[in-house]
Design a protein with these regions (language model features):
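Short, conserved, GDST-rich strand-edge loop motifs in beta-rich repeat architectures
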Residues: 1-3, 97-118, 159-182, 229-242
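A short loop-to-beta-strand structural motif that recurs across blades of beta-propeller domains
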Residues: 8-10, 60-62, 122-124, 185-187, ...
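Loop/turn-rich, solvent-exposed surfaces of beta-rich toroidal or solenoidal domains
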Residues: 211-247
Length: 257
């Protein structure tokens, strides 16, 4: 479970399956000063524009654009964290990120042995040319996460869970005992490229009203279909045995497994 220290980001040639290493996690790791890399993402499958996160030792977000590589740190007092889950705009030099306070538990009796959950999260937009950050959604008593653009770049989809944690006992403790009450639904906001503004939040799938939790929205290349993961609760469905993939026809708003 803790072998993340040996992670590498590789690329494979589809013509002959030759592999080469883009980045080796052990290059900057040493005993007691480990590094963790992941969340690599490209702009519309373009290898000339890539980003990945490096955490812990020498942490930051590595952005490679048009042959130039740089490390940035978006952590600021006004943000919950540095950027976490990324989503490149299809053709503009913009990356939507969630910022998250994340925890995890290990269970012995529950059939889902690992539980990863947030106690707070927002969605932001990072301008890679001007190094500026603007909020997209940071509502009180809501946790927004997993941004994803439509193929035309006119909509930003994301998940949001409405829940109010107790301040008297602390968010971490309350979330730890009520993690099965955290249920995400899928929203989207219209994006205006000319003035870089977002519209009001539009509810696309009210999973919470159906006692479910929907995460990781992805839009088909034609723009007509939404694929998402859905389970009984929470945001990290990779650990949930009951979770499955669903598809929604955005023209009829009907969903099916």
């Amino acid at each position: 479970y803790v072998t993340y220290e040996k992670l590498t980001i590789n690329q494979r040639c589809l013509e002959n399956f030759d592999e080469s290493v883009i980045y080796d996690n052990m290059l900057c790791s040493s005993e007691g000063k480990e590094q963790c890399i992941n969340c690599h993402s490209y702009q519309n499958y373009n290898p000339d524009k890539m980003q990945f996160h490096a955490r812990q030792q020498n942490g930051g977000t590595i952005i490679a654009m048009d042959g130039k590589v740089r490390k940035i740190n978006m952590k600021h007092d006004s943000l919950l964290s540095a950027g976490v889950y990324p989503a490149w705009h299809p053709h503009l030099n913009l990356i939507a990120y969630s910022t998250n306070h994340t925890m995890q538990n290990f269970h012995t009796r529950d059939k889902n042995k690992v539980e990863v959950f947030d106690t707070d999260s927002d969605v932001i937009l990072f301008d890679t040319e001007n190094n500026t950050v603007m909020p997209v959604s940071r509502l009180k008593d809501e946790m927004e996460s997993f941004p994803s653009w439509s193929p035309d770049g006119k909509w930003l989809y994301y998940c949001s869970a409405k829940i109010e944690f107790s301040d008297s006992i602390g968010k971490e403790y309350d979330a730890n005992t009520r993690y099965k009450d955290i249920k995400y639904s899928i929203y989207r906001k219209a994006f205006n490229e000319k003035d870089m503004t977002f519209g009001e939040a539009e509810l696309i799938w009210d999973a919470a009203a159906n006692n479910k939790s929907a995460t990781l929205p992805r839009i088909s290349p034609c723009g007509n279909y939404l694929v998402y993961a859905q389970g009984a609760y929470g945001c990290f469905h990779v650990w949930h045995n009951d979770a499955d993939l669903y598809i929604m026809d955005l023209r009829t708003m009907e969903s099916k497994p």
